[in-house]
Amino acid sequence: MKKNKNYVDLKDQPVPEGQHLLEVDDLKMYFHTEDGVVRAVDGVSYTLDRGETLGVVGESGSGKSVTAMTIMGLISMPPGKIEGGDVRYRGRSILEMTEEEMQHIRGNDIAMIFQDPMTSLNPVYKIGRQVGEGLRLHRGYSKQEALKRATELLDLVGIPEPEKRVNEYPHQFSGGMRQRVMIAMALACDPDILIADEPTTALDVTIQAQIIELMQEMQEKNGNAIIMITHDLGVVADMADKIMVMYAGRPVEFGTAEEIFYESRHPYTWGLIRSIPEQAIEEKKPLTPIHGNPPSLMNLHEGCVFSPRCPYATDKCRKQRPERVVTESGHYSACHYSGDPEFLKNAPETSRTRKDSKKGGEA
C-alpha cells in the first residue's frame, strides 16, 4: 500500500459531540456455509472512549475474535456477511469504508495483537523489518528511520539488547519476547484503539502478568483505548473499566468491572466467576465447572442460548429469548430473571463477599 498524501488521518479529527471514540451498534456477522448459516456475532453493542479498557470475555466460539476481526475488516466476504448493525470510529462508519480506507485504519488508527505471535510473525523476515513496516506504510518513514524507531520500540517494551535483536528472526525469540514484539508492532503508529486477542493465553503466569502490566503502562503513556479479549475473567479483573460477557455469539451481560464482579446478574457470568481459582489456599475449595458444552451456532433454539447448561433454567427460558434488562447505569443482562431480587441471591458467594468486604473497608 502506497501512502496516500490526500488521506486525512482520522486520529487528527475530533470525536463528534455526543459520540464515542468507537461505537458498536447491534453488530451481526453471519457465515453462510454449505451446512447452514453460522451466527458467529449476533447483536453486539458497546461503546469505547480514549483511555478506557473493555474486557470481552467468553468461552472459545463465543464470537469474541470474530467481533474484533469484523471491526478490523479482516473477515472474508463471502463466506462472511454483515447482516445488520454498524461500527463507527470517530463518527464514521467503518463498515461503509472502502478497502483502501481500511488499509489506512488498520495499524494506524486501530491495531491488533493476535493470539499466536509465532504464526502472526513472518519467519523469514527480521524482527526490525516487521516492527517498522507499519511506520513505512502509514508514516512514510525511510528504511533507516523505521529500523531506528523499531529499535526504540523494542527497548520500550522491555526487550534487552534491542540494537541486536532487531536483526534477529522470530524463532530466536521466546514466547514472551515474541508477544512483546507483537505489542511493539501494534504500538508503532500510536493507534487510538489497541485490540488484544488473548495475548497471554500461551504464556506462564509470570510472563502473563508482565505483558498485562506492559499494556497498562503503554496505555497510561499514550492514552489509547484497549479491547482485551480473553476467556478468563481473572485476566481482566484489574485492568478493565468495562466488561462484556459473550456466549454463543451474543452479549449476555455488560457493565463496569465492578458491576460484573460484584453485581453480576446472569448465570453464565456467575459460572465464569465461580471458575476463577481462589487465592486462599487454606480453604481448598474445588473449582466449579460450567457443565455441558456451548451450542452449535447453526442450530440455536428459540429460547435462551444458555438454558441447556443453566441450573436455574425454566420452561420460559427454553421457549422465549430473553430481552436485555438494563439498569440506570447502563449495566444490562440478557436473562428473564435478572430483575428478580430472589433470583439474584443465587449469585456467587465470592462475589457477594468481595462486595461486602469492600463496603466494610469504606465504612
What does each model-identified segment do?
Residues 14-18, 257-359:
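Charged, flexible cofactor/metal-binding loops and thiol motifs
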